[in-house]
Amino acid sequence: MSIKSDKWIRRMAESTGMIEPFEPGQIREADGKKIISYGTSSYGYDIRCAPEFKVFTNIHSTVVDPKNFDEKSFVDFHGDSCIIPPNSFALARTLEYFRIPRNVLTICLGKSTYARCGIIVNVTPFEPEWEGYVTLEFSNTTPLPAKIYAGEGCAQVLFFESDEVCETSYKDRGGKYQGQQGVTLPKA
């Protein structure tokens, strides 16, 4: 398995719709102001957060159970930025829609700009033939409220191409998050 370059990412995005919308360069400024960068980098793609958030709250004092998750644990919020309470988290989704080729696996890592502020972005790998908007998890590890920005970079996707095609893809096995459209809560 080898990591793929900016040239490969551009070619795949433009010819197969692997990433939509796609930014072929690296954007660091908008409307004359500095932003957290997004777009194609040397060996990855910096994804953006959409203005759609689910902020975790403890108002119902419930147990967090991934097999029986209570939707009332979240407050829905739409906006250009989102404040995450201390020691809490928020879910969001990418602006970009992904279509992963059958011989490719991705790993997604948080951007250091957020990590240096105690905000950790967690995303699982995008498996072969998975497609959809990516659900993002932002953890605020600080004792203070933390701000995240919609429309700006939040994580980097690295693409790895296998030397052979997998026998069973995410699509083949009917993966439960296939084709997700919005912020998607846990499914057992």
From Swiss-Prot:
Residues forming the catalytic site: E137 (proton donor/acceptor)
Superkingdom of the organism of origin: Bacteria
Enzyme Commission designation: 3.5.4.13
Disulfide bonds: none
TM annotation in the entry: none
Catalytic activity: dCTP + H2O + H(+) = dUTP + NH4(+)
UniProt keywords, alphabetically: Hydrolase, Nucleotide metabolism, Nucleotide-binding
A biological-process GO annotation: nucleobase-containing small molecule interconversion
Gene Ontology MF, one: nucleotide binding
InterPro entries, alphabetized: dCTP_deaminase, dUTPase-like_sf, dUTPase_trimeric
Pathway the protein takes part in: Pyrimidine metabolism; dUMP biosynthesis; dUMP from dCTP (dUTP route): step 1/2
Top-level EC class as recorded in UniProt: hydrolase
Membership in a protein family: Belongs to the dCTP deaminase family.
Job of this protein: Catalyzes the deamination of dCTP to dUTP.
Record text on subunit structure and interactions: Homotrimer.
HAMAP family: dCTP_deaminase (MF_00146)
Protein name, as recorded: dCTP deaminase
Organism of this sequence: Polaromonas sp. (strain JS666 / ATCC BAA-500)
Gene: dcd
